[in-house]
Amino acid sequence: MSLQFLRSEASDGAGETSDASSADFLLDPQTATHLARLTGRPCNRLIYRTALTHRSVLHDHHSEEHKPESNQRLEFLGDAVLDLLISEHLFKQFPGSDEGHLSSNRAKIVNRKSLAAFALELQLGEHLIIGESADKQKIRTSESALADALEALVGAIYLDQGLAGAERFITNHVIAKVDLHKLVEAEYNYKSRLIEYTQSRQLPPPLYTVITEEGAEHEKTFVVEVSCNGQPLGRGTAPRKKDAEQLAAKEAMKRLESGDLGNLNEPSPQNS
């Protein structure tokens, strides 16, 4: 296959940078002070202003010469930097986790709701640059606008301070706010995952049934089966019923994710 989009020479188009010194729009003193506390001393102040510029400014009247740039491009870059650095952190912290668990945990950290919460704590909404005709108060508290601003800020830090600077910011203001152990516990709560799976597919809730209960009171063994829509999904065996249910749900999730089970939307013939 011919990859025609690849450059024939690595130097073509390289080294293009924006000239912050020629910028007509810089940061106001309060925002500059706030960003310095969060990121260290900015070198390219224009790029941080762009990171905080909401797309609503594009609807204002500007001459072509002085037309501002919104934070959407920086948001794209920051999203990739966040994914990379959060992925690396989880990869190192949890050497026993497989790709699926790592991806799931990363998604919990970098989803829009989480990013907006981080941005709110960093008071980014108060420093957003918003179009004159836009609803400023609504945008300053908007989940989407806050998440976009955080991603754009990460992109700006990356361009201004490099990967090391972006990593410092993410470590101090994102990772430090996440209880990774609770995150992993939630990931390994297979009963919760199974409920989420059935709810997302408009299926009946999972049903757990004790198949056998053997042994004396202090040394019992439970065998629990979980089913959905009359179809058995998995079994678990453990000294505690709660643990047996988790193991049954774990087997069910493994089979569901591997496509080992049929269509759960069709009730089992025995229940028809």
From Swiss-Prot:
Its main location: cytoplasm. It is found in: Cytoplasm. GO terms for molecular function: double-stranded RNA binding; metal ion binding; ribonuclease III activity; rRNA binding. The active site is at 79, 151. Residues 1-22 are annotated as: Disordered. SUPFAM superfamilies: dsRNA-binding domain-like, RNase III domain-like. Keywords: Cytoplasm, Endonuclease, Hydrolase, Magnesium, Metal-binding, mRNA processing, Nuclease, RNA-binding, rRNA processing, rRNA-binding, tRNA processing. It catalyses: Endonucleolytic cleavage to 5'-phosphomonoester. InterPro entries: dsRBD_dom, RNase_III, RNase_III_dom, RNase_III_sf. Residues 31-162 form the RNase III domain. Residues 189-258 form the DRBM domain. Mg(2+) binds at residues 75, 148, 151. Its cofactor is Mg(2+). One of its GO terms (cellular component) is cytoplasm. It is an enzyme of class 3 (hydrolase). HAMAP family: RNase_III. Digests double-stranded RNA. Involved in the processing of primary rRNA transcript to yield the immediate precursors to the large and small rRNAs (23S and 16S). Processes some mRNAs, and tRNAs when they are encoded in the rRNA operon. Processes pre-crRNA and tracrRNA of type II CRISPR loci if present in the organism. Belongs to the ribonuclease III family. This is Ribonuclease 3. It comes from Chlorobaculum tepidum (strain ATCC 49652 / DSM 12025 / NBRC 103806 / TLS).
